[in-house]
Each structure stands twice: as C-alpha cells, then as structure tokens.
A protein has these predicted regions:
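N-terminal Rossmann-fold NAD(P) dinucleotide-binding loop
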Residues: 12-13
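NAD(P)-binding Rossmann-fold cofactor-contacting core
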Residues: 22-44
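ADP-ribose/adenylate-binding Rossmann-like module
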Residues: 66-70, 77-93
C-alpha cells in the first residue's frame, strides 16, 4: 500500500518512522510539508529516505494519505483527497 504523509512535525515524523519500520506491509512514498529540507535531514536514518511531493502529487500518487498537518490545513487537504479519490486518515486536531 502506498502511503503519503502530509505534515512533518513531531507527529508526522513518528508516523513515518513507524511505517518505515513496518515496510514489508506498507510503503511511504513521500511527504508533503512546508519545510522541504526538514524531510531530507530527519529521514536520513530511515530504511528508505523519503521524497518531498507537492500536495497535488502526494494525493495523486498515494493509496492513503495520513494527515499530520495543523488543523487549519484540513479543508485544503480533504478537498485534494476528494479530487483524486484518495483515502484520508487524519491524526491532527
């Protein structure tokens, strides 16, 4: 299953790290975040380094998107997921 993560603060990082450890069942294709460089720096120790994607790209390429972004971003995220018929799991406020 191809998983995309939106938001890469403390929650997004922990979600990505756990999925990376369970990589036989799941595959994180990448992350969308306001801070692109943070993704590269924080995932250098992962089994598979993560790629940065735009919001459109991550919703289009993922089977499931996990929303770890601040609640203010939810409306835009859910609209993109609806546009691309992508399943959405939200773990943020």
């Amino acid at each position: 299953m191809k998983i995309g993560i939106i938001g890469f603060g403390a929650i997004g990082f922990d979600v990505a790290k756990k999925i990376d450890q369970e990589k036989d069942q799941f595959h994180v294709i990448g992350v969308h975040s306001r801070t692109k460089n943070k993704i590269i720096d924080k995932t250098s120790s992962f089994n598979s380094p993560l790629k940065y994607f735009s919001l459109d790209e991550i919703c289009k390429k993922s089977d499931v998107v996990i929303d770890c972004a601040p609640k203010e971003a939810f409306k835009e995220i859910i609209q993109k997921c609806l546009d691309y018929k992508t399943k959405l799991i939200t773990v943020s406020g």
